[in-house]
Amino acid sequence: MANKIRVRYAPSPTGLLHIGNARTALFNYLYARHHGGDFVIRIEDTDRKRHVEDGERSQLENLRWLGMDWDESPETHENYRQSERLELYQRYIDQLLAEGKAYKSYVTEEELAAERERQELAGETPRYINEFIGMSETEKEAYIAEREASGIIPTVRLAVNESGIYKWTDMVKGDIEFEGSNIGGDWVIQKKDGYPTYNFAVVIDDHDMQISHVIRGDDHIANTPKQLMVYEALGWEAPQFGHMTLIINSETGKKLSKRDTNTLQFIEDYRKKGYMSEAVFNFIALLGWNPGGEEEIFSREQLINLFDENRLSKSPAAFDQKKMDWMSNDYLKNADFESVFALCKPFLEEAGRLTDKAEKLVELYKPQLKSADEIVPLTDLFFADFPELTEAEKEVMAAETVPTVLSAFKEKLVSLSDEEFTRDTIFPQIKAVQKETGIKGKNLFMPIRIAVSGEMHGPELPDTIYLLGKEKSVQHIDNMLAKL
């Protein structure tokens, strides 16, 4: 095994980058960068049935968007896709066959299904029963000849040491062990189509690429003893394994499901909605790991410096969309204006709102944004029809002092010349209404805000009125007075 730390992220190109897989990549990336090691990308494309066109490109594009870089990948190195490594796998399969550590299996899918059904009806744990048990060499040869004559293409199975104990000290979960008798019998290492199975190919790849640490989700724990069997059969040292806990929905407490449409689970979704990649990176880094303390906002460089595998959580990581949005808002509020405007610009352009007011509108709503696509509904006031009032807003406007406040403020606005109507002159007009009417606080400000914007909350009121313009602000107040 290599002395230098080398980790890998090895996705299957079967679709978009899920947040769980992004976390796997990110923790491997942080671990490698913290220790001065190598971060390797390898594509595991042996499952041809689930292969998705452009799946590999999507994975790499989204990792790059998150801000990860890598040292080796199919983009720069040959044979970093499993489909390009079939000769290498065949070499080791032939070796195991020659050494009697693996054998060709001619049992059919129908026979396997029938045996599985029998075992289940008998209350037995389903497992493969070696088809050659009880056969003499002559009977075995006749069986193989008959099967091959029938056109049956064999698989290759690894001969499992049923009395073996397969254990490791997990980087996250501590000591774990499996008995060879509980693996399910001799298992397939090469399918009928000539492709290796995952648990075989991954061992060959990790050894060949000198991977020192395998950090992945704990859904892979059951795969680890099988992989240890391959390491043992080939006489190789296994890497260190670390299995991260599941990501669960913070509201239901259940495993995060791709069918849950209330949460954004694919990195592509965050890109399309205009989240800052730095915010998504920060959020994912805290799913099952924390550096200690109360602080939650970290730059990429800080996360690299702080990353400590000993602080990987043993408890499930809660995915909280509200926390993601809070964190995203914090990043957008504190980002430079040019970066935020660049994110908002495509959404404004698509909505036909890239006017001379666009920059001022983004500046106005920047503190409220959780994602850049929100700039369109937030600016409806300036482009769309006046919104219907909510019940809470109607209740505010039902107060007997509202007509007095609105009429007085309208008069103040009308009295201002175009030159006098500026952002800085609006607040003094509101204070003048307070002085004249004796109405103050929410009873003063809230009716004006609702009458002008149709909302109880929003940017600073003088900013909204100034950008809306005197004429339109007066028009909105007149319309509201007519409804009272």
From Swiss-Prot:
Q: Which residues are noted in the entry as ATP-binding?
A: K258
* Family note: Belongs to the class-I aminoacyl-tRNA synthetase family. Glutamate--tRNA ligase type 1 subfamily.
Function per UniProt = Catalyzes the attachment of glutamate to tRNA(Glu) in a two-step reaction: glutamate is first activated by ATP to form Glu-AMP and then transferred to the acceptor end of tRNA(Glu).
The answer to keyword ATP-binding applying to this record is: yes
* Acyltransferase is among the record's keywords: no
Q: Which NCBIfam families does the record match to this protein?
A: gltX_bact
What is the recorded name of this protein?
Glutamate--tRNA ligase
Kindly report the protein's main subcellular placement as a broad class. cytoplasm
Q: Where in the cell is it found?
A: Cytoplasm
Native organism is Streptococcus agalactiae serotype III (strain NEM316)
Placement of sequence motif 'HIGH' region: 11-21
